[in-house]
């Protein structure tokens, strides 16, 4: 009987951390779990959650690379970042963002830029670097986050192409309030001592959205012949297949676009593992498109009051799962009251 032999080309924590030369094209990204609410903690650093596309920016002997989390080359779509100045032997984890006229990251503006019509609106693009994975051709994945952040800041990268945002210690609750005040997506809380775990979704990193949102798989589209798409039938990746996650309303100004964007993925059968009621105008879908939806945030496996926001440019089925929020104990805030707002301002590339 033949034993299972690991694929030597598949990146793992051991392979990456034992490498002593060269910089990988990318690393399977570490992902946060969902927090039940904002909290203060002496064990965490708090950062702005960016409304962009996860990406890796690196430079080796062959030059600069900008790739998405699946390893796809982003430079043809974002040529403005070809002259980003980072040292050889460095690999950064971060997000590509485009900002609106008020300096706030806008996924919609980024999606328009990366879409088929390449509408170059908004300010940017810019790469927001929040982690340093390689330096001097050597991996830092096992080093604690706090050290990686200090090394990242010491590189002095901040310019018009690359931004290194600030972070806040201890006081996550007032930081979340400041992020909400400025109309940003949310925050991420990261344990100071956490290593970088490729492809890991652990409670060492926790995310919290100002407006609850989720990645879902589009399993069906309800079409109105005059209006276009009216509702999406959403699903989560689950054991055994696609679990029904409820409906998401499609705003009228996106109805025709969603109708056209989903036609090529139509199917003659339901992709869901359990029966879902058929209705007039229903188009079943192959479970390949990932949508971002905003919702009411109520607990449970089905969305409440969900509203379609955008297609996920870098989506994958593994990200479209029902998340159980993590409960975290909080402590009293310790810093100056104005500090959270200042950190938010200093983090914004065009603030």
Where are these regions (language model features)?
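Catalytic cores of nucleic-acid ligases and guanylyltransferases
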Residues: 1-351
């Amino acid at each position: 009987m033949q034993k299972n032999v690991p694929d030597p080309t598949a990146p793992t924590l051991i392979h990456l951390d034992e490498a002593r030369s060269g910089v990988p094209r990318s690393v399977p990204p570490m992902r946060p779990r969902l927090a039940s609410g904002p909290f203060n903690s002496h064990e965490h650093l708090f950062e702005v959650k960016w409304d962009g596309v996860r990406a890796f920016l690196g430079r080796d002997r062959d030059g600069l690379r900008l790739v998405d989390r699946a390893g796809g080359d982003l430079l043809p779509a974002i040529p403005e970042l070809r002259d980003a100045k980072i040292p050889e032997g460095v690999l950064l984890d971060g997000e590509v963002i485009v900002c609106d006229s008020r300096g706030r990251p806008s996924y919609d503006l980024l999606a328009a830029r990366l879409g088929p019509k390449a509408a170059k609106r908004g300010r940017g693009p810019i790469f927001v670097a929040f982690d340093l994975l390689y330096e001097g051709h050597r991996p830092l994945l096992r080093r604690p986050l706090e050290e990686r952040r200090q090394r990242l800041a010491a590189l002095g990268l901040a310019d018009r192409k690359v931004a290194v945002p600030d972070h806040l210690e201890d006081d996550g609750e007032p930081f979340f309030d400041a992020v909400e005040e400025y109309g940003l997506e949310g925050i991420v809380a990261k344990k100071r001592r956490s290593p970088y775990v490729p492809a890991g979704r652990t409670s060492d990193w926790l995310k919290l959205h100002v407006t609850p949102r989720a990645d879902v798989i589009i399993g069906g589209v309800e079409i109105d012949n005059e209006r276009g798409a009216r509702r999406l039938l959403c699903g989560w990746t689950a054991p055994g297949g696609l679990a029904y996650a409820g409906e998401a309303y499609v705003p009228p100004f996106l109805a025709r676009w969603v109708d056209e964007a989903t036609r090529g993925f139509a199917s003659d059968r339901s992709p869901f593992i359990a029966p879902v009621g058929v209705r007039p105008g229903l188009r079943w879908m192959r479970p390949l498109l990932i949508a971002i939806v905003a919702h009411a945030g109520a607990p449970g496996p089905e969305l409440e009051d969900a509203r379609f926001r955008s297609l996920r440019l870098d989506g994958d089925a593994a990200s479209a799962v029902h998340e159980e929020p993590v409960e975290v104990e909080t402590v009293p805030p310790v810093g100056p009251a104005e500090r959270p707002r200042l950190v938010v301002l200093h983090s914004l590339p065009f603030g």
